[in-house]
Each structure stands twice: as structure tokens, then as C-alpha cells.
Amino acid sequence: MFNFNYGLRTITLNHPQKLNSLNGSMARKIIPRLQEWSKSQLANVVVVKGEGRALCAGGDVAALALQNKEGPEGQQKSKDYFALEYKLDHMIASYTKPYIAYMDGITMGGGVGLSLHAPFRIATEKTVFAMPETNIGFFPDVGGSFFLPRMDGQMGTYLALTSEQLKGVDVFWSGIATHYLHSSSLPDLETRLAELQFKDYDSLQQRLQVINSTIEEFCTGVPHDRHPSNSIVGGDLRVAIDYAFQNNSTIDQILEALQGLTENKGNTAPPSVIDWAAKTRKTILSRSPTSVRVALRQLREGATWDIAETFRKEHVIASRFMEHPDFVEGVSALLINKPKTTPQWKPKSLDKVTDADVDAFFAGQPSLELLNTEGKAEEIRYKDYPHAWTGLPREREVLGHVNRNRCTMKEAVEFFVQHSGGKQGVKEKVEEILRRKADESESGALTLKR
């Protein structure tokens, strides 16, 4: 459903009974509208939102699995669907007008593709985020290869392999959302966005700055009981995530690290970490072994891919999964069979998935032709989001500042608060990073931990 209100253009996904799951028909309707609005001088801002409990709970994977059972012809239809979806996601990632995603409710899979690459991603107390693909014999697609490895520390790898959910303000602390608002504020924000006026010669950057300030006006504070230090994105659990999923670790090394935390032989791990490690190890071992191994390699390689390369290579991987039995098995077990069944993965364990098996998912020349907003074949390329400044400071930015400038905690916090224009959550985020990653001398000067 498409709405017009002064300079605001709204895309509303309105299949609440199916949690607004994305299908080919919806994608085919959205793409030409985005192209039309990009050329319209009357369209200033685009908002995407969902009716009911979800922005979008994912693609209609049940329909794809049933299609795949038909054999090569059905599998080709599924491959064509992913080509269409990734073209839409790339268009959003390179859109020439301000684009805002209301992540107000369940935002998973295909819904992540509609929001993750937007310059503005608004979480609320109702937000539930996840990349659940390894649980259905698939991989974290829709540009996950780009976003996840660029998250702070090893959060992206953890979320990809486990399908773990983040809820509410934790979606904001993690950097997945750029802003956190109470859901009751969203209609008023929409009205305000419709009233915004820009000069014809205003650059995209200038327009984004105005919208950023406008959204901040509606921020009423973050929950006092969900400081980043007592959530999974900070504190002891975050230290454990970065340790267990550290760069260049193989899946066997990750499982070994989790086992070590579970056994706690040095008596150094708090009970919350011990419980988390045991649960996380069990979760990974229950996922599709093929999906887990492919996803880990995907994230390691995706850290160097540009945004266009990401979607083209993901289409190769997705096409291979449409031919693999685990996708049909996982979707059937979780979403089609009544009651749900336990999936029988093939191969059934991680040690049975060979390097050659994984290589096959990355083999072949990418052929996906991406579109720009004029409908022409064009690949917008960047290796980091040009609009990354709209969110909270990233860990590497905070640590880089401290490394370059001998400063105190107070000075570092003041710098980032001022640099962000007083953005909500900056103080808490910077403090949590520095308490976890730096030591203070008697004079208060910070030194990064080794």
C-alpha cells in the first residue's frame, strides 16, 4: 500500500496475518514506486512500515520451499525471486532520497533487507530483530554479508550463526537501528516528516542532516533498565562474544572456545557467561551444518566486499541453497509441518561438511544485474555506509579517537556527544565501550587494553 502526504511517500506492508512476509508481487510493486519517487521533485522522504505486529518477518520462504520440491523449474523460480529481492535491497542501499525504516515490531530476514541499509532505522520497544536463516537451512542474506561483519566486535558473526534475537533498545545499542523511539511517537514523526521542505539544490547529505535532527526531536529517552552494559551488546556477555567468535576462528575453534567458557576451569567466568556459552554452543550445533559453515565463510569474505558485489555474490549463494536439501527440510520442519518437526540435516553434522562442499556455494561468476533508481543497470559501489554517521558511534571510531588523543573518559564522552549534536544514547554507548576496552590511570587518562 502506497500513501502520499505532502512531501512524504509511505510504503506500508499490509499482510499482517502473514506478518507482512515479502513475496515477489510486493517487490515488483515497490521497485517502480521507488524509481518514480526518486525522480519526483514533490517526493522528499520515503518511509517504509508494516501493519500489525511486524515490519516484515521475512520472505515467504514456505512458498519457495514448496516451489523447490517441484524440481529444477521450481528452483529456478525461487532463484528469480531472490534476484528480484536483492535488486530491491540494493536500490534501497543506494537510494538517492532520504529513506526511513520503521522497525516497529518483528523485523527478520526479508524485513531486514528493507531496513538494514537505510540511512535511518528506527527501533521501538516492540522491535524484534533476527537473522534466522541458519535455522531453516539458508544463510544470512539480504546484504547481511555487508552489514554483519561491519558491526562492532564479533556481534555480527554471533547473530549470523545463532539466529539470536535482539529486542527493543538492544537493537539500537547494537547499531542495527540508528534511533530509538517509543512506538506512540511514530505517527507524530510521520506528520512532521511530511511537512519538511527542502531547496532543490540541497544535497542528499544536507537533507539527511535535517531529517536526523527531526527524528531526534521525538526521542524521549532510553529505558533505564537496559543500559548497554547489562545487555548482550555490552558488558560480560559482549566480552565473551568477542572472545569466542574472534576474527579468523574456524567453527571448530568457536565451539571449543564456547566449551571452555562453559567448563570455566579458571573460575573466571560469571554465571551469566557460563549459561550463555552452553546455550550458544547447543544452538549452533542444532543449526544446519551446511548453513553454519557457509555463513561463517560468507561473513569473513563479506568484510571486503563492496555493496554491489555483496548482492551479486549473495545471489550465487542463494541459488546454490535452492538446490540443497537443507532449505526445504528446514523450512518444512519449522514452518510447514504441523506440529513442527526436528529437521534432519544433510550432512547431519559439522564435521561431515567438507571444504569442497562450502566452496561450491561460492563457485561461479555472479550474473545478477542490479538497477539504479532510473531503472538502468548500474552498480553503486561503496565499502562502508556513506550514512554511517546517523547511528551511534561505532566501537572502532571510539577506540581510534582514544588511541590518537590521550584523553580521559569524560573528555572522550564529551567529544562524541558534541560531535553527534547531543544524540540520544551516545554518552551511554561511549562509556560502555571504554569501560570494557580501556584502562584508566590515576590521573584518569585512558589506555586501550591489549
Report residues per predicted region.
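Contiguous mid-protein beta-loop-alpha structural module that forms a pocket-lining wall or clamp
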Residues: 154-200
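Glycine-rich beta-to-alpha active-site loop
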Residues: 92-136, 158-168, 179
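Conserved CoA-thioester-binding segment of acyl-CoA-metabolizing enzymes
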Residues: 1-49, 364, 384-386, 393-450
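A structural preference for short, pocket-lining loop segments at secondary-structure junctions
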Residues: 6, 11, 29-72, 91-102, ...
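Hydrophobic, secondary-structure "cap" segments at the distal end of domains
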Residues: 146-154
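Hydrophobic/aromatic residues within transmembrane alpha-helices
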Residues: 48, 60, 114-115, 170-171, ...
